[in-house]
From Swiss-Prot:
Keywords on record: ATP-binding, Cell membrane, Membrane, Nucleotide-binding, Phosphate transport, Translocase, Transport
Compartments where located: Cell membrane
Chain's role: Part of the ABC transporter complex PstSACB involved in phosphate import. Responsible for energy coupling to the transport system.
Keyword Ligase: no
One Gene Ontology cellular component: plasma membrane
Organism for this UniProt entry: Tropheryma whipplei (strain TW08/27) (Whipple's bacillus)
Record-annotated ABC transporter domain positions: 5-246
Name of the protein described by the UniProt record: Phosphate import ATP-binding protein PstB
SMART domains with a match to the protein in the record: AAA
Pfam families reported for this sequence: ABC_tran
Length: 257
C-alpha cells in the first residue's frame, strides 16, 4: 500500500492563532483514516488544509507541505485540488431548491465538464446506486434535494462528491446530525467507497472510528501554546488495543475528551 497524501511539518493559522503545529502524517491509498481527539485539537482544520478550504478563511495560512501523489497541493490549481479531494460536511448540505438530479450533477457543471445528457443520466444513476440511494429516489429525481430526510441528504451529498471522481474524500463528522439508522447506512457506505477512494474522516465517536477505519491518528491540544498536535498514528487495531502513548490510552478510555 502506498501513500497518496503526505503531510509534512504542517502548521496552520487563523490570523495569529495557531490551530495545528508541525503535523506529519501519511495517508495510505485505498484506506480509511480516522482523525480523533478532543474538541479544539485541530482535526477539522487539518482536514480543511487537505483540499485548500482552509485558505478561504480570512487571515488563514499554512506552513509546511501537503503532497498529493508527490505534488505540492499548494502549488496546484485550487479548482483541480477540490476535484481530486472532495469534502463532506457535518450537516448535509444539498442545494435545497435544486432537484435530486441537479444536485448529483452540480459538480460536473461547476467544473464545466460537457457530457451528453444520456451520459449525464448514466452518471447520475451510477452515483446514486453507489450510495444506495437510487431505489429510494428514482421515481422523484425532479423533486428538490431539500425534501429528502437527513440521512438521504447526506448520501446525496456523497453522490454529488463522487460524480467528479475524486481520489480522496474528506468527511468532517458526517454522521453527527444523523439518527442511528442513517449513521449505520453512512458507515456501511464508507467501507464500500474505499474500494475506489481514499477516505479521511474526522469523528468524535470512537466506536465509529474503530468500525470504519484502517488507520487512526490521535490529536490533542498541546500544553504549550494551545495548538493541536499529532499524538500517535497507527493501524486502528493497534490504537484501540495497545496504544503506545499515554495520552492516547487516556483518551480512548474516556479519562478526558
Amino acid at each position: 500500500m502506498t501513500s497518496l497524501l503526505e503531510i509534512k511539518d504542517l502548521t496552520a493559522f487563523y490570523g495569529p492563532l495557531r490551530a495545528i503545529k508541525d503535523v506529519s502524517l501519511s495517508i495510505q491509498e485505498g484506506s480509511v483514516t480516522a482523525l480523533i481527539g478532543p474538541s479544539g485539537c485541530g482535526k477539522s482544520t487539518l482536514l480543511r488544509t487537505l483540499n485548500r478550504m482552509h485558505e478561504l478563511s480570512p487571515g488563514a495560512k499554512v506552513k509546511g507541505q501537503v503532497l498529493l501523489d508527490g505534488r505540492d497541493l499548494y502549488q496546484l490549481d485550487p479548482v483541480y485540488v477540490r476535484q481530486e479531494v472532495g469534502m463532506i460536511s457535518q450537516r448535509p448540505n444539498p442545494f435545497p431548491t435544486m432537484s435530486i438530479r441537479e444536485n448529483v450533477l452540480a459538480g460536473i457543471k461547476l467544473n464545466r465538464k460537457r457530457i451528453h445528457r444520456i451520459q449525464q443520466n448514466e452518471l447520475m444513476e451510477r452515483c446514486l446506486r453507489s450510495v444506495n440511494l437510487w431505489d429510494e429516489v428514482h421515481n422523484r429525481l425532479g423533486r428538490p434535494g431539500g425534501e429528502l430526510s437527513g440521512g438521504q441528504q447526506q448520501r446525496l451529498c456523497i453522490a454529488r462528491a463522487i460524480a467528479v471522481s475524486p481520489r480522496v474524500i474528506l468527511m468532517d463528522e458526517p454522521c453527527s446530525a444523523l439518527d442511528p439508522v442513517s449513521t449505520k447506512a453512512i458507515e456501511q457506505l464508507i467501507c464500500k467507497l474505499k474500494e475506489k477512494h481514499t477516505i479521511v474522516i474526522v469523528t468524535h465517536n470512537m466506536q465509529q472510528a474503530s468500525r470504519v477505519s484502517d488507520w487512526t491518528a490521535v490529536f490533542n491540544v498541546a500544553r504549550s501554546g494551545g495548538s493541536g498536535e499529532l499524538v500517535e498514528h497507527d493501524k486502528t487495531e493497534v490504537i484501540f488495543t495497545s496504544p503506545k502513548n499515554e495520552v492516547t490510552l487516556n483518551y480512548i478510555s474516556g479519562k478526558f475528551g
